Amino acid sequence: DSRVKLIATATIGFDHIDTAWCAAHGIEVTTAAGCNARGVLQWVGAALVHLSRTQGWQPAERTLGIVGVGHVGSLVKAYAEGWGFRVVCCDPPREERERCGFRTLEEVAREADILTFHTPLDASTRHMADSRLFGLMKPGAILINSSRGEVVDGEALLRSGLGWALDVWEHEPHLDPALLENALLATPHIAGYSEQGKANATAMSVASLARRFGLPLEGWYPPQAAPARRRPISWQELCRTIGGAYDIASESRSLKERPGDFESMRDHYAYRREYF
């Protein structure tokens, strides 16, 4: 029997933990799910602004498909609707539980001009975006992935004729050179790297310890990080301000020029400050 009673990971995922073994040995596992949702939202916002500028469209002219409507996807949905996109969503587990009118993956793929993935990685989502799905999408549609690299079949994406903007990659840190070179945007798995996201993850892990072991630390938050001011932001304001908060195009150029620095870029990242 293990002396370990709790594993509190300060990450949103748990694919690095053998949860079945832990459950069989009475070890509780908690994650920091949702800790960096606003950081990812702002990465997606920066990507959309960049794409609209370089391709010459406005949100009202585009349908945004969202796959996975959890912590991140629900935020992207709310803000994207406010920015003027037509939004269609797919989340089979939530649809089964809640009957909330979400669409099938195939329907969303057919309708979307831009398809963004916000799913965990498990057996049902591995290579969810494959050649069959790409064949349903509009010519010239764009795929965005900031969830897990293995959600997308990279080899099939290369053959798809679609555009893509990727923060996560199969076989990280070893990136497919063609996938990287041809990406509209390419970043080194840092979509959620915000000051507040890091602080939230730490606070959530401490809260798990406090609850499990009766420690007087409920409500603790890292004193050096101010929680984000959550507020609506218009498309016009986003276009004016996002470049000052996060230069996604510059970061993309850096990764394309120095793909071998993938891990170093992550390890020495200057965490962004959330501002909406």
Predicted regions and their residues:
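Phosphate/diphosphate ligand-binding glycine-rich loop within oxidoreductases
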Residues: 1-56
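A short helix->loop->beta-strand "cap" motif at the edges of active sites that frequently abuts
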Residues: 2-5, 25-28, 85, 138-141, ...
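Glycine-rich adenosine-cofactor-binding loop
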Residues: 33, 41, 58-81
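Oxidoreductase and adenylate-handling cofactor-binding alpha/beta cores
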Residues: 41-57, 82-85, 202-211
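NAD(P)-binding Rossmann-fold cofactor-contacting core
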Residues: 81-99
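Rossmann-like adenosine-cofactor binding region
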Residues: 94-178
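Rossmann-like dinucleotide-binding domain for NAD(H)/NADP(H)
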Residues: 140, 146-276
